[in-house]
């Protein structure tokens, strides 16, 4: 009994320390998070069955109604490469433009930029990578050559007063190269920032990252680029998306990409889950007292709508749980 009595205070001290650590971690969280909804573009682009234009438009309008302030609407790529995005101009022209909401579109080159602007785009996104092999297999050039292509886009965007967002894929791992050096991610991110991208989204393309790897990567990147110019884009292939996102928030990132209903698979891991579900992200942020401006019920309705249209189950744990209640 005496031994147990002596052991108890030590255990209590341990619990108190744990509580203190987690409280101090929570103190570093942002009061507000901007969610960039990528479902209509990143989520739908790999769907085998073509989604009708009216369905895409209704989905985006429902997401706007839910209070999301940034909704990536479509991609101005060649229909030859991404047939799902062939109706990009019709979608961008057909959606309701809500005040205070931006509707960026992804573009691969200057031709895509010009088509996007002609369709009324006010913001565009460009896509790079921290992996040489991934870049070579995706766009058939080196990282340096890809930036030469981006240069023309950024100059044209500046002249047209169009905001440009950059994506860096494979920041926590590559399907071809494996581990990626944090220094390489920092180098590529710094290049995007110095060229004029107002925000750079750091993507864990194959979802292999863990909070420790996320911390190391962000520590390197934040030595070159201010946290206010960074976003994270986590995939849930290994179930780490929310944990990695929380680590990024604790380190000062306040912009997070996510996809309604978790739309968007990982093309490098058959059957694996893809994007972080927006519903799950909002639920976590609300639980932490972080403002998002998003109405979770309306968001769930948007997720339910698109899942019915696709004849598939949602990947959102929150949506799955609430439909059972």
Swiss-Prot record:
Coiled coil where? none
Query: What reaction does this catalyse?
Result: (3S)-3-hydroxy-3-methylglutaryl-CoA = acetoacetate + acetyl-CoA
Pfam families per UniProt? HMGL-like
Motif Microbody targeting signal boundaries: 323-325
| Catalytic residues (UniProt) | 266
Alphabetical UniProt keywords: Acetylation, Disulfide bond, Lipid metabolism, Lyase, Metal-binding, Mitochondrion, Peroxisome, Transit peptide
What the entry lists under PROSITE patterns is as follows: HMG_COA_LYASE, PYR_CT
Binding of a divalent metal cation, residues: 42, 233, 235, 275
Query: How is this protein annotated for GO cellular component?
Result: mitochondrial matrix; peroxisome
EC number(s) of the enzyme? 4.1.3.4
**The protein's name:** Hydroxymethylglutaryl-CoA lyase, mitochondrial
Ranked from the top, the taxonomy reads: Eukaryota, Metazoa, Chordata, Craniata, Vertebrata
Encoding gene per record: HMGCL
């Amino acid at each position: 009994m005496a031994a147990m009595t002596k052991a108890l205070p030590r255990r209590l001290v341990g619990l108190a320390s744990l509580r203190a650590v987690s409280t101090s971690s929570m103190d570093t969280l942002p009061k507000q998070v901007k969610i960039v909804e990528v479902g209509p573009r990143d989520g739908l682009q790999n769907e085998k069955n073509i989604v009708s234009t009216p369905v895409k438009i209704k989905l985006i309008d429902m997401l706007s109604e839910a209070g999301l302030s940034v909704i990536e609407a479509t991609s101005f790529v060649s229909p030859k490469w991404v047939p799902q995005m062939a109706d990009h101009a019709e979608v961008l022209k057909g959606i309701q433009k809500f005040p205070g909401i931006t509707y960026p579109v992804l573009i691969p080159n200057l031709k895509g930029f010009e088509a996007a602007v002609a369709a009324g785009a006010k913001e565009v996104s460009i896509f790079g990578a921290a992996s040489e092999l991934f870049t070579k297999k995706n766009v058939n050039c080196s990282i340096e050559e890809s930036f030469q292509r981006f240069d023309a886009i950024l100059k044209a965007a500046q002249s047209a007063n169009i905001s440009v967002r950059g994506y860096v894929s494979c920041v926590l791992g590559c399907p071809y190269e494996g581990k990626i050096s944090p220094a390489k991610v920092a180098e590529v991110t710094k290049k995007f920032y110095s060229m004029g991208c107002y925000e750079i989204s750091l993507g864990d393309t194959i979802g292999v990252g863990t909070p420790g790897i996320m911390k190391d990567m962000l520590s390197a990147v934040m030595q070159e680029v201010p946290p206010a110019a960074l976003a994270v884009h986590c995939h849930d292939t290994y179930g780490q998306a929310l944990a990695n996102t929380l680590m990024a928030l604790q380190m000062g990132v306040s912009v997070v990409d996510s996809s309604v209903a978790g739309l968007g698979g990982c093309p490098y891991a058959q059957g694996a889950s893809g994007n972080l579900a927006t519903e799950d992200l909002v639920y976590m942020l609300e639980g932490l007292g972080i403002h998002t401006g998003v109405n979770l019920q309306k968001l769930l309705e948007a997720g339910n709508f698109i899942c019915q249209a696709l004849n598939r189950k949602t990947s959102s744990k929150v949506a799955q749980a609430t439909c059972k209640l």
